[in-house]
A protein has these predicted regions:
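CN hydrolase (nitrilase-like) catalytic-core segments centered on the catalytic cysteine
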Residues: 91-108, 202-361
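Residue-level recognition of beta-strand->loop/alpha-helix junctions
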Residues: 9-11, 64, 72, 139, ...
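Short loop/turn motifs at secondary-structure junctions
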Residues: 4, 56-57, 104, 192, ...
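N-terminal glycine-/serine-/threonine-rich phosphate-binding loop
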Residues: 1-44, 49-60
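Active-site beta-strand/loop signature of hydrolases that rely on acidic residues for catalysis
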Residues: 31, 36, 40, 50-80, ...
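Active-site catalytic loop in hydrolytic enzyme cores
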Residues: 88, 114-231, 235-244, 249-252, ...
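Conserved beta-strand and immediately adjacent loop positions that scaffold enzyme active sites
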Residues: 4, 124, 332-334, 367
C-alpha cells in the first residue's frame, strides 16, 4: 500500500501562537520552489517534495512535539495559558481539526494538555481523521527534564500500546471504531501504528539499560509497521546539556547564540545532523538486521516463513528547529524504512543496508518533507 506523507519541521516561538499557525499554513500552501531568502535574523521556510505538488492529496501529516506553542517553558505558570484539553479545544487542537478537514488527511499534532479527569498536565499529541474527528490522544510516557520543569506528568497508561489507523479512502479510524463483523471484502487498509514523543525513544529517565529499547521493543512486539515520533529533539551541541558546574546560564546563552549564528551562516547549504539521525536508527535496533538483533524478523525477508514479503517498517521522525534560550534544536526530520533484506552486519547507522533513508530535512530551516511511501 502506498500513502503520501508530509512532515512539517517548524520553529514555534513561545508566545507567538498566531505567527506559528501562520507558518504552518505557509508551508502547506507553498509551491515546490524555495522561498526567497529572508534576512539573517529569520529562518528560511523551504520545501522538499517528490513526485507531487504541495497541494496534492496527503494521506498523513505529522507536526512536531508542542507544535505551535514552543517547548522550553520555565515553569507551570508559564505554560498554563497554552494548555488545552480534548473536551475544550484550544489553538493546537482547533488547528489540527481545521487542517484535517481542509486537506482530508490523518493528522498528528503535539500539544500541551490539561486533563480535567485528573487535573494533570501532559505532553500529548492528538490524531485527527480526515473528517476532523479526534480519534486518538497519546500522552508522553518518558519525560525529559524540561517536561518536569513545567509540570508535565507521565502517561498513566504504560507499555506504549499500539493503535490501528485506517488509510482506506473513505474511512480514517482507529481499530476500536471498526465493526468486528466486517467481511473480507471490506476496503479498510489498517496499519498497526505506535506513537512515541521524543524522549520516549530514550531509556527511561536515562537510567534504564541502554539496550532495553522500551519504545521500539514494544512497537516491535506489537508488529507495528508505522512509528510516528513528534519531537523537540536537541542538537548534539546544544549548550543546555552542558554541565551546570562548568557553565552558568549566561555562558550557555552566549554559546547558544554562537551556535545559531554558525548554523545560519550556511542556510542555503544546511545539512541534517547526521549523528542525530544515526542515533534515532540505533534506538530502533530491534528492527535492524544486525548480528546482535536477535528478535525474529516478521517483515519482508523473502527467505523467512514468518515474514510478509510486502511489509516494511516505516519510522517518521518529525522534529523542530530553532533556539529557545540556551536550547538549540536539531531539526533533521526524516523518514526511515527498515526492510529486513537479510543482509546482516555490525553497523547501527545509515550504513546498515537494512535501513533506508527515504528523505530528510536539514537542521536549521522550517521545512516540509513530502514523500510517497510503501507500507
Amino acid at each position: 500500500m502506498k500513502i503520501r506523507v508530509a512532515l512539517l519541521q517548524l520553529n514555534p516561538r513561545i508566545g507567538k501562537i498566531n505567527e506559528n499557525i501562520s507558518n504552518v499554513y505557509k508551508l502547506l500552501s507553498s509551491s515546490t520552489q524555495q522561498q526567497p531568502t529572508p534576512p539573517p535574523s529569520q529562518t528560511t521556510i523551504t520545501t522538499t517534495t517528490t513526485n507531487q505538488q504541495l497541494n496534492s492529496k496527503f494521506d498523513l501529516i505529522v507536526l512536531p512535539e508542542l507544535a505551535i506553542t514552543g517547548y522550553n517553558f520555565p515553569n507551570s505558570t508559564a505554560i498554563k495559558p497554552y494548555l488545552e484539553s480534548i473536551d475544550k479545544f484550544g489553538p493546537s487542537l482547533n488547528l489540527g481539526r481545521e487542517l484535517s478537514i481542509k486537506y482530508q488527511f490523518i493528522l498528528v499534532i503535539g500539544y500541551p494538555e490539561f486533563s480535567h479527569d485528573d487535573n494533570k498536565i501532559y505532553n500529548s499529541c492528538a490524531v485527527f481523521n480526515r473528517f476532523g474527528q479526534l480519534i486518538y490522544n497519546y500522552r508522553k510516557s518518558f519525560l525529559y527534564e524540561t517536561d518536569e520543569v513545567w509540570g508535565c506528568n507521565e502517561n498513566p497508561i504504560k507499555g506504549f500500546p499500539s493503535i490501528e489507523l485506517d488509510f482506506s479512502p473513505t474511512s480514517n479510524k482507529i481499530r476500536e471504531d471498526i465493526n468486528v463483523n466486517e467481511t473480507s471484502e471490506t476496503t479498510t487498509q489498517l496499519i498497526i501504528t505506535n506513537i512515541g514523543i521524543c524522549m520516549d525513544l530514550n531509556p527511561y529517565k536515562f537510567e534504564a539499560p541502554f539496550n532495553k529499547f522500551e519504545f521500539s521493543m514494544s512497537s516491535y512486539s506489537q508488529r507495528a509497521k508505522l512509528l510516528i515520533c513528534p519531537m523537540a529533539w536537541l542538537n548534539p551541541s546544544s549548550p543546555s546539556i552542558l554541565d551546570n558546574e562548568e557553565f552558568d546560564k549566561s555562558d550557555k546563552l552566549e554559546l547558544a547564540q554562537e551556535l545559531e549564528s554558525e548554523l545560519k551562516e550556511n542556510l542555503d547549504s544546511a545539512e541534517a545532523s547526521w549523528s542525530t539521525i544515526n542515533y534515532w536508527i540505533l534506538r530502533f535496533f530491534p528492527y535492524l538486521s544486525h548480528k546482535y538483533s536477535i528478535m525474529p524478523k516478521w517483515f519482508n525477508n523473502k527467505t523467512s516463513t514468518e515474514a510478509n514479503n510486502d511489509e516494511k517498517v516505516t519510522v517518521l521522525c518529525c522534529n523542530r528547529v530553532g533556539v529557545e534560550e540556551d536550547v538549540v534544536y536539531a531539526g533533521s526530520s526524516c523518514i526511515l524504512q527498515f526492510n529486513n533484506h537479510g543482509k546482516y552486519n555490525d553497523a547501527t547507522d545509515l550504513t546498515n543496508e537494512s535501513v533506508e533513508l527515504i528523505g530528510n530535512l536539514d537542521q536549521i530551516n522550517e521545512s516540509i518533507l513530502i514523500k510517497e511511501i510503501d507500507l
